[in-house]
Curated annotation (Swiss-Prot):
Taxonomic classification: Bacteria, Pseudomonadati, Bacteroidota, Bacteroidia, Bacteroidales
Family: Belongs to the SecA family.
InterPro entries: Helicase_ATP-bd (IPR014001), Helicase_C-like (IPR001650), P-loop_NTPase (IPR027417), SEC_C_motif (IPR004027), SecA (IPR000185), SecA_CS (IPR020937), SecA_DEAD (IPR011115), SecA_motor_DEAD (IPR014018)
Enzyme Commission designation: 7.4.2.8
Region described as Disordered: 1060-1126
Pfam families for the chain: P-loop_SecA (PF21090), SEC-C (PF02810), SecA_DEAD (PF07517), SecA_PP_bind (PF01043), SecA_SW (PF07516)
Alphabetized UniProt keyword annotations: ATP-binding, Cell inner membrane, Cell membrane, Cytoplasm, Membrane, Metal-binding, Nucleotide-binding, Protein transport, Translocase, Translocation, Transport, Zinc
A GO MF term: protein-exporting ATPase activity
Name this polypeptide is given: Protein translocase subunit SecA
Gene: secA
Catalytic activity: ATP + H2O + cellular proteinSide 1 = ADP + phosphate + cellular proteinSide 2
Functional note: Part of the Sec protein translocase complex. Interacts with the SecYEG preprotein conducting channel. Has a central role in coupling the hydrolysis of ATP to the transfer of proteins into and across the cell membrane, serving as an ATP-driven molecular motor driving the stepwise translocation of polypeptide chains across the membrane.
PROSITE patterns: SECA, SECA_MOTOR_DEAD
Amino acid sequence: MGFNEFMTKLFGNKSQRDLKEITPYVDKVKAVYPSIKALSNDELRAKTDEIKQRIQDYVAEEKAQVEELRKGIEDKELEEREAIWAEVDKIEKAITDKMEVVLEQSLPEVFAIMKDTARRFAENEEVVVTANQFDRDLAARFDFVRIEDDKAIYANHWKAGGNEITWDMIHYDVQLFGGVVLHKGKIAEMATGEGKTLVATLPVFLNALTRNGVHVVTVNDYLSKRDSEWMGPLYMFHGLSVDCIDKHQPNSEARRKAYEADITFGTNNEFGFDYLRDNMAISPKDLVQRKHNYSIVDEVDSVLIDDARTPLIISGPIPRGEEQLFEQFRPNVEVVVNAQKDLCSKLLIEAKKKMASDDQKVVEEGSILLYRSFKGYPRNKALIKFLSEQGVKAQMLKTEEYFMSENMRHMHEATDELYFVIDEKNNSIELTDKGIDLLTGKTDDPTFFVLPDITSQLSQLENMTGTEEEKQAQKDEILANYSVKSERVHTINQLLKAYTLFEKDDEYVVMDNKVMIVDEQTGRIMDGRRYSDGLHQAIEAKERVKVEAATQTFATITLQNYFRMYHKLSGMTGTAETEAGEFWDIYKLDVVVIPTNRPIARNDMNDRIYKTKREKYNAVIEEIVQLTEAGRPVLVGTTSVEISELLSRMLTMRKIQHNVLNAKLHQKEAEIVALAGQKSTVTIATNMAGRGTDIKLSKDVKDAGGLAIIGTERHESRRVDRQLRGRAGRQGDPGSSVFFVSLEDDLMRLFASEKIAGLMDKLGFKEGEVLEHNMLSKSVERAQKKVEENNFGIRKRLLEYDDVMNSQRNVIYTRRRHALMGERIGLDVLNTIYDTSTAIADQHAEDFEGFKLELFKTFAMESPFTEDEFKSMKPEQLVEKLFEEALKTYKRRMERMTQVAHPVIKQVYENQGAMYENIMIPITDGKRMYNVSCNLKEAYDTECKAIVKSFQKSIVLHMIDEGWKEHLREMDELRHSVQNASYENKDPLLIYKLESYNLFKTMVDNMNRKTAAILMRGQIPVREEPTEEQRQAMQARQAAVAQQAAQAIAEERARQRIAVQEAAPEKHEDMSRYRTEKTDLSGNNTQAEAPQPKQAPVRAEKRVGRNDPCPCGSGKKYKNCHGQGL
């Protein structure tokens, strides 16, 4: 017996240990259940209210402390507030921790209440209680509640997901186990059909009693809407509000209310995007989310693992005209792609001839041609078919070994003849010299699509003679040329990818003249989502639909980092154990396997393996015919829209009735799924994660053998296959599952087929025959493991890059939230001035003149100390003294702002306060005018201190948004550029971390300086009353200027009179008949009947500009001489 076996025998395996830990909780629930069951309906609801109050009372003291601290914070000096806010944060964390203690104490009673609520709805058509206001409000909105006299009557049937449902579920013991696991912040793995949705009601109900919000996350909007409608009445019965964000538009009042509900359902993407939108809001009332308290993720593996490969990005258009480039270079790329296809087809024909020879040398030559064809066009259907023939794949792999050996020293021999090389596994394309020559054939410049060696060019420039100005001009030209060519090469690469690696009706569909992405996991259209980095535009150009404008990232986050923000995170799925390590590494989530309520009776058969797709699909159709004749419903799972439509056509030709559920037909989802369990029904579905909960079987169907699952291809992920299998055999029902696989399937072609192909060859396997063995099924699973490991690597790398960004995002978003809410903005402004003082002192530590100039530019103030003092001070003393003086200056200027504004605000509020809610205050920094909106009453009550806060908010928000947007662009560019570090045997991630830190530091420094410069200069423009001497001098100047102007006008008029006399007389038309009456705003005629006096024409006289030389000849500017005061 090995050590592991001995330890397992001694302590039990992980599942046994987990269940042992949870069992006491379940025993307590079962112990308290009889007393809960004995309560009347009203007493049951009263018990819930009692527990709600108990939870609030448990933390009442701490909440009172926070309230008290918040009240007095505005009266404190800025310097004192930091300590108070730190204390508030500390107490709020303590409240969250104490909540967990009281929830654990309340768990047995609360779980028992929810279980008995489910029982009462299952056993009674109506549940009657004494009506309260919450019941009356519900009755006005929903059909399942009605009010009769003082009674609220809850029906046990309602609509969910488009179907009428009657409540018939009561929690089993295993579901109580699952509920405890979810409350503990772990992942519950429960077999498909074990009622995961019902399990969630237990921890959701318990945690919602805190009134801090519970988020239930689903993989698609159909499920989020359905589950909120399905489970909602149970929560509402106990006075809890329920809503679903997917029912409301983003940034709407309705969506904000959905987040304020005790329980909020929604899709993972919408939760993430709402977070990003909140961090782009410009007013607190635009925020929709509250604190991230507790989240339960349904199909947790799909959300936290599969979807985690793609970051969430909010982007906006940028005026760069890239779309023209994609359309401009499309013809060039089409020429190259068509040339490559023709070449690869010819190579394949030649390879077939040579490989049929008896001469081994000729066979080897043919094998090289075959490999060359494979590197140039791996998705060629004729090539895929040829590779499935006996011995062919093995021969090509042998050739590949030669080219891959010695660090790919000989690879150029295989690829030089091609126009470009495709690496399908890594999703990349590389142009060869031959391809570049063909691309540039119609241009005059042979390097039109070649990136110059910028490093050597700049190095040569440094060694050249010439002035600094000349060198700089040449450097700018080199950089500009590189930028243009870089954009050009990038466009070509993305177009090549679009033409060779992305297939219509597979990765995307074209609907309503738009390219729409299909989610590879769920088969649904991802409306509003676009491929990044210009790839979407390339596909639009390829499909000849409108190429949308280029976009720039405004906000981004990975799902991993979004969900890690929750205080407590848990999830449920039928298939998490295979990824338990990843869940722990990234999310610190433990996976607990919950036993099934009844043994699984489903027959999972071995994979049936064919050589070609054609044979496979014919076999699938034959299998469907046999199963439907036996009276069994059949669910056919496909991996793409294209395959589902192909099978649909084949079934139609055989006159077999069927339903199709895919990205193009998702509107009929509820109806199709509801029918999928009926006798002899055939349903084709692109992906079935989370859809099968509605497949119910009749007795006839169960007697016939239950639901039959047919997989038409093994998915990249074992979990997706397990989800498909799990649609049959739910709750002990009979059923079967089998996968049909061919060597031409993508998974087999890329990762598995060499061993299986070799085995088929050894067995003398003929076309049309099927191979079925447990060992082969295991081989397919090993191929899936390879893909999963590869995908895990992608996710982990994405997270490592986003972790760098995440720390920066937290700093920026925290500062932005402080500015938006206004509570802590004073502290942040204080820190901004301090950081700017530090940066100025550090930058000019040895240069007093530079220091003085920088102070004037940034703080608009003179140096507070002499050159001798500056040189004698230590750096920290210099910073402290400078900060002290800068802060004094800032406070003095803000005080001045309030003094200037107060009389105006007082007059407006006291005379017209009822008419206006907000007032716009013009504030200038001497360069531009900022119109700052402020609440009129608040400005009046605070003696205009609110105006200062509004000014701070608008400037800080503007600077953060501008700086962060530009920083994201630079980070995108950095991430692409650091990949080249791998050619120098350096870790790109390490370079990225170092460079991104420098970029962030520079961005924050610039942001601080710009913010400080505007805030320090901010003032309300006023016209100051001049002194008597100034008034007299001004009048004298104005008289002199007026005299000069009168003289100039008289001379001009004399010239014009002469010109008029010399010119021929012109004919004038009487325009009076076109005159219309003028009316005022009330519609009254304002035009007098008396003849109007003739108005003199307005002539444009030559006027002196403020910055022009003064006409008096003094040499000064007009504004500083005779124009002063004008």
